[in-house]
Amino acid sequence: MKDFNAAFDSLLSKIKNKENFAFTRFSDGELFILQNKTLVLADNYYITGDIKGRNRYTKEEHKEFYPEQHQQYRNKLIETFKHNQNNYFKGICTSTDGHVGKQNFDWMIDFHDGDHNNLTFANLLINANYSRFVEEMVPLFIDREILYVVNELADTSKLPFEISKKFEIGSNCMIEDYGIAEKVKDYIRETGTKDAIVLCSAASLSNFVIYDGFDDNQDNTFLDIGSCLNPLLGLEGWKYTRGYLTGYWLNSGSPFQRQVDVWS
């Protein structure tokens, strides 16, 4: 059975040893898209399939997926999910997240045509591993060339490492900024970039950037970090929806800060 801490150690070791790899995440949003369910995050509500509820989402978190309009993006996401390649790691949801449950974990395994060595935890860098991400992994970025796919509202000037190239995206970026994946791939090819780390904080667009980029060139590392750096980027949405972040940065006592995900 896969182990949450050991899986983190594996990626950390690869970064320390400058062994290039890709880590792409299929969290709950990607799960719903794969399942062909409507997905909307708006200012004060969300829709997932037939379920509508209230929550607060700031502009950088807004997204929309309507099955009747956006099948080409779902098809691309399926392609990224089904793809297998050496050192191409795909994080999926587990039943440890109550709103996901074992039924959806089993669904993802089945949709993937079975478990695989390259499947891992979508939450690998967050929850109980988040403190290690901040304190052990982020310092390793200082000595690496960093490319960053990040929201246009983010202020990257306070990050503890330098960014050599930034690719800015807006709201609903999977659809509105679909072409960024090609731009990242072309930039790497044209500049001869090698042994850089490409950080992605671009919702489901991250899956496209990482898949296209690593499939084309395995000489760089592609890392989907989601909202992990948002407290350092001057963004506010994490304070309302990310317990692992409020637990670490605001001492909120959120149980997500202690959650060790289990492979089931």
How would you label these PLM feature ranges?
Residues 158-196:
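A mid-sequence, solvent-exposed acidic-amphipathic segment
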Residues 137-147, 196, 243, 256-263:
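Long, contiguous secondary-structure blocks with strong helical propensity
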Residues 30, 203-205:
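Short beta->alpha connector loops
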Residues 205-264:
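C-terminal functional extensions of proteins
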Residues 1-161:
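Electropositive, gly/pro-rich neighborhoods at or near active sites that engage anionic ligands
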Residues 51-54, 166-173, 223-229:
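A generic structural motif
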Residues 197-201:
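Short catalytic-loop micro-motif centered on adjacent basic/acidic residues
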Residues 7, 72-77, 179-189, 205-207:
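A short, acidic, amphipathic alpha-helical segment used as a generic capping/interface helix at domain edges
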